[in-house]
């Protein structure tokens, strides 16, 4: 896209779609870029369905992955770096008249930071930022299609979804039985922790996966992706009509 093409697209758009994710380990069978590849693919589907209502931004590959740093290849940002990066993108878009941003987030570790970023964007920039993560948007569909009690990372669910959205990141010939699973505490363990505690991934698992990827099912992945895409599009169309905050900002 040239600057003149961008000028036309931004003039028509009511919102921007921004893909984010992470570069981190995903067990023995999935690539380091799994999260951003999935986030990018979902963002492309969303932007395509929205048409001229939205403009698709270049993706932000890196995210918050401190808890995976014992596994080689993982690259993490500090929370303040991640926040500054997203907010600078939002501020730049606002300069060109787009003050609503939907962050299509492929990484669960970014969720808490994105909540704070949304507040800061409204307070300091007068912009609306919404973030959606596929595992949250489709949580009810996922629960119907889960075969094991423990899942959450490089598991049958994430493998199934990636096989649909970004099959190039999945090496099915390397899928293996779970190894070295441990409980830290029943109330902090995935997939539904009841107590917030910082736990590092290597304290739960030796191979970097939580769940059994051998149980992946492409048809389940298709069903989850269909539900997530439909809900994301419905939300984005409503979001595009939400009134903007007063400038220069402020929680209203």
Question: Which residues does each PLM region occupy?
Answer:
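Extended, histidine- and acidic-residue-enriched regions that form the cofactor-binding/catalytic faces
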Residues: 1-102, 108-252
């Amino acid at each position: 896209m040239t600057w003149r093409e961008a000028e036309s697209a931004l003039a028509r758009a009511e919102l921007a779609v921004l893909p984010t994710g992470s570069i981190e380990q995903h067990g023995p069978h999935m690539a380091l870029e799994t999260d951003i590849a999935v986030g990018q693919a979902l963002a492309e589907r969303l932007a395509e369905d929205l048409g001229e209502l939205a403009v698709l931004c270049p993706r932000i590959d890196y995210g918050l992955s401190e808890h995976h740093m014992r596994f080689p290849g993982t690259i993490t940002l500090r929370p303040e770096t991640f926040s500054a990066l997203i907010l600078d993108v939002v501020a730049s878009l606002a300069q060109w008249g787009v003050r609503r941003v939907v962050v299509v987030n492929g990484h669960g570790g970014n969720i808490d930071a994105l909540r704070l970023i949304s507040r800061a964007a409204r307070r300091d920039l007068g912009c609306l930022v919404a973030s959606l993560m596929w595992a949250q948007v489709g949580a009810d569909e996922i629960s119907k299609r889960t075969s094991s009690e423990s899942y959450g990372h490089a598991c049958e669910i994430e493998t199934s979804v990636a096989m649909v959205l970004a099959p190039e990141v999945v090496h099915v010939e390397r899928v293996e039985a779970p190894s070295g699973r441990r409980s830290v505490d029943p109330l902090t363990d995935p997939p539904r922790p009841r107590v917030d505690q910082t736990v590092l991934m290597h304290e739960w698992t030796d191979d970097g996966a939580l769940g059994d990827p051998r149980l992946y099912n492409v048809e389940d992945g298709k069903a989850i992706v269909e539900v997530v895409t439909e809900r994301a599009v419905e939300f984005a169309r409503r979001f595009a009509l939400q009134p903007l905050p007063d400038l220069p900002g402020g929680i209203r």
